Amino acid sequence: MNTRGSGSSSSSSSSQASLMAFSEPPKPASQPSPPSSPMSERPPSGRSRRRAQEPGRFLGVRRRPWGRYAAEIRDPTTKERHWLGTFDTAQEAALAYDRAALSMKGAQARTNFVYTHAAYNYPPFLAPFHAPQYAAAAAAPSSVQYGGGVGAAPHIGSYGHHHHHHHHHGHGAASGASSVGECSTMPVMVPVDPHRSSMSSSLLDMDRNGHDFLFSGADDNSGYLSSVVPESCLRPRGGGAAADHQDMRRYSDADAYGMMGLREDVDDLAQMVAGFWGGGDAADQLGACGFPASGGAADMVASSQGSDSYSPFSFLSH
């Protein structure tokens, strides 16, 4: 009895399993998975791969909290950041960055926009400050007409209009019809006036003559007045011997007039001394000292010539 029960149970279970197998849908054949490469398993590093540029953002442009956009660029050689300015829109800041990048790296620069080959002819970024030879090279082919003519100075484009906006406002009147974003590196040429040039040459000659007049050579440093002041200033031109004789006569008349005034002063001094001592004793004392008691300058000169005693006014007689 037990064998029949066990056989019936096993047959029923097998029949149920077969029914379940027919009821299940057939499984598709599995395809072999491709072998995984070792590069895909490694996570990408931030230094090796550059971060993808987000839409709406530009290289070298940052947005300020108050709504303006700042542009700056980093020098690849010195690793220094150069400030390009703040702008109202992100496109203007991106243009300023592109011009600075083209000035630094040329065709190898990464820019925000696509440019033609003509845009690569910008001067170096720091040319106006560190390389004056670029300005001299630009001035060589320029043609300038002097004497009232007007010369056309070449213009070299800068890397940004807003980077030196105060320079553009300052040179606006001089440049005239210069385009936006360009600045002139040529100096302003002033036409030469022939009359002013002759005046300047005459002033230069006067300056040189004055220098020769004040600072003479080493061989003329004798110490006399003639080595400092020319003889033409000391002696008037023309006249010859007659002029010299007239000058000597003028000097002798002046000396005689001075001696007369000095003798009158001596007479006044004698009278003052006589009044101070008083009486006849004064005359004796004046006679002993060599002063005449009366008679004026003539008696004093006569007494001084006739007496052997010392007189302090004896030099007046010579």
UniProtKB/Swiss-Prot annotation:
This protein's name: Ethylene-responsive transcription factor FZP
Keywords: Developmental protein, DNA-binding, Nucleus, Transcription, Transcription regulation
Compositionally biased intervals (Pro residues): 25-37
Entry GO CC: nucleus
Disruption phenotype: Altered specification of terminal and lateral spikelet meristems, resulting in the generation of a panicle composed of excessive ramification of rachis-branches.
Region listing for Disordered, in residue ranges: 1-59, 158-178
Function, in words: Required to prevent the formation of axillary meristems within the spikelet meristem and permit the subsequent establishment of floral meristem identity. Mediates the transition from spikelet to floret meristem. Determines the transition from panicle branching to spikelet formation. May specify floral organ identity by regulating the class B genes (Agamous-like genes) MADS6 and MADS17, as well as class E genes MADS1, MADS7 and MADS8 in floral meristem. Possesses transactivation activity.
Family listed: Belongs to the AP2/ERF transcription factor family. ERF subfamily.
GO molecular function: DNA binding; DNA-binding transcription factor activity
Biased composition (Basic residues): 160-171
Entries under SUPFAM superfamilies matching the protein: DNA-binding domain
DNA-binding region residue numbers: 57-114
Organism, scientific name: Oryza sativa subsp. japonica (Rice)
